[in-house]
Amino acid sequence: MIFRLPPLEQLSKLIQNRLLSNLPGPQAHLRMEPETRKAFLNLKHAEAPRQSAVLILLFEKNGKIKTPFIRRNIYDGVHSGQIALPGGGFETHDNTLINTALRETEEEIGIAKNQVKVLG
């Protein structure tokens, strides 16, 4: 079976409408996760988790919908060398996590925020 995505404008409207409705939240995650993961739900972080945001950028090229990824730098840390969506940590001047995602996307892949239509 081949799954074909609708054109980008139509897909954008579908995503926006879906984001306006109730999302399945934790219950959907619980249905899909392995039993072994449930043991970790009550663990506490040593420090408060850092707020961060990513941008799932969709664009059309040669009739196909695409999304860019980045490869993180190699360093001594848990995210070293990972393939990831553009994004990063919240900074107070961002004011919102959407602004964080837009700022980080511009820093990491050079797409200016005025070139992005935020769906949600």
At which residue positions do the language-model features occur?
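N-terminal leader/linker segments that precede catalytic domains of diphosphate-processing enzymes
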Residues: 1-84, 89-120
